[in-house]
Amino acid sequence: MSQTNANDLRNNEVFFISPSNNTNKVLDKISQSEVKLWNKLSGANQKWRLIYDTNKQAYKIKVMDNTSLILTWNAPLSSVSVKTDTNGDNQYWYLLQNYISRNVIIRNYMNPNLVLQYNIDDTLMVSTQTSSSNQFFKFSNCIYEALNNRNCKLQTQLNSDRFLSKNLNSQIIVLWQWFDSSRQKWIIEYNETKSAYTLKCQENNRYLTWIQNSNNYVETYQSTDSLIQYWNINYLDNDASKYILYNLQDTNRVLDVYNSQIANGTHVIVDSYHGNTNQQWIINLI
């Protein structure tokens, strides 16, 4: 296997799924049941979450604009659609990725002789496997594509005018209303070795770091390459517009606004995941 790559197929991560020879088109849920290729617009109906089943060793592929709907082979027909999750074998897929070309074959679990295929009219179907290029797909990690090496601001879901900010006279991270300061601007960078992200403050080029003490504060700190400086960034389970940031030192703990307060100067901490709004963040490019 080659070096870890952001587009490796990992459980619970979200991807664009494109023809291998045309990443300007992606799988698109164009109605409550129909799925086909469409021009890439980056909407939630074009983002797909992979859910791995360890017993079947296969994936469900859920669309992010309605996560009760998953990619389904309409057996015994050749067509595919999105349908309500019934846990049927026709709703699971083997994903076979070539780690050099990054091409993926999407093979149905119910009948492994059948693979997903796109047609010249952009419709999708299952067919017996051939060497044809229209049975090869690319998976592109949505968050990596959107955020890696980008300048961003992080807004708490608690209030539309409270942002992740370095304190004026210390390294401590707090909430503060937006005033277009370098203390509020962050460069998000992916690390292939850790398979996680760092967030670097533009003011001091120091990294968002979980300080493991009784307060569980977050500060900016010089790079130590410690897990406390790395974050798994993912969408909410059912919302591709909001994010949770999990600390790599303990992925049950996430970036959190203390006590759901919104006053300027409220501490940002790391706390156990519960998914409430004080752990939800909106990340916008600057």
UniProtKB/Swiss-Prot annotation:
InterPro entries, A to Z: Ricin_B-like_lectins, Ricin_B_lectin
Source species, domain of life: Viruses
Spans traversing the lipid bilayer: none
Pfam families reported in the protein's UniProt record: RicinB_lectin_2 (PF14200)
1-beta repeat positions: 56-100
Primary localization class, coarse: secreted
One GO molecular-function entry: carbohydrate binding
CDD domains: beta-trefoil_Ricin_HA33_rpt1 (cd23495), beta-trefoil_Ricin_HA33_rpt2 (cd23496)
1-gamma repeats: 101-148
Task of the protein: Agglutinates human erythrocytes. The hemagglutinin (HA) component of the progenitor toxin protects the structural integrity of botulinum neurotoxin; may increase internalization of the neurotoxin into the bloodstream of the host. The hemagglutinin (HA) component is involved in binding to the upper small intestine through interactions with glycolipids and glycoproteins containing sialic acid moieties. Binds galactose or oligosaccharides with galactose at their non-reducing end.
General remark: This protein can also be encoded on a prophage.
Protein name (database record): Main hemagglutinin component type C
Annotated gene: HA-33
